[in-house]
Amino acid sequence: MARPRKEAPQRNLDRDENARQQPTEEPQDEAPRNQGRQQQQQRPPAAPRRPRRFRPGTVALREIRRIQRSNVPLIPHSPFMRLVRELAAEFLDDCRFAAETFIMLKEVVEDELVNHFGNVQICSIHAKRIIITVKDFKLAKLLKGEPED
């Protein structure tokens, strides 16, 4: 036995067609759209936004990470040369250096400083602090096995 087929309800086509065909009337007192754009351009500029304030220590940690990622020399060349010459003058009377010596010494010193500051930062984070302090330096030195001054 076949089921009787249900037919879709008849829509009132006259009402739907009339709704679609009605023209939309624009009010006559409104200005054209182009004039609105010109008025927007003539407005005075908005006040500049204040820079966003980050929580304390956020910028410091960002700078530490940026410096750790970089591979540019952090110690200026001239002051480093002067310091090495002063230290060498304390031990030797007449001492001369090749140019490569300063480059090699500078790389070794920077590497040692970066490693030491990394250890100091780990000590600071372990103590649940963001700012590194003198006691972090002392703890890092103690953990490294160097005698305390």
UniProtKB/Swiss-Prot annotation:
In the record, which residues are listed under signal peptide? none
User: Where in the sequence does UniProt note compositional bias of the Low complexity kind?
Assistant: 33-44
Q: Name one Pfam family in it.
A: Histone
Which keywords has UniProt assigned to this entry?
Answer: Chromosome, DNA-binding, Nucleosome core, Nucleus
Could you tell me which residues belong to the region Disordered? 1-58
Where located?
Nucleus; Chromosome
Where along the chain is composition biased (Basic and acidic residues)? 1-19
> Could you describe the subunit structure of this protein?
The nucleosome is a histone octamer containing two molecules each of H2A, H2B, H3 and H4 assembled in one H3-H4 heterotetramer and two H2A-H2B heterodimers. The octamer wraps approximately 147 bp of DNA.
What's the encoding gene here? gH3
Q: Which family does it belong to?
A: Belongs to the histone H3 family.
The protein's GO terms of the molecular function aspect are: DNA binding; protein heterodimerization activity; structural constituent of chromatin
* Functional summary from the UniProt entry: Core component of nucleosome. Nucleosomes wrap and compact DNA into chromatin, limiting DNA accessibility to the cellular machineries which require DNA as a template. Histones thereby play a central role in transcription regulation, DNA repair, DNA replication and chromosomal stability. DNA accessibility is regulated via a complex set of post-translational modifications of histones, also called histone code, and nucleosome remodeling.
Q: What is this protein called?
A: Histone H3-like 1
Tissue expression as described in the entry: Pollen specific.
Would you tell me the Gene Ontology cellular component terms? nucleosome; nucleus
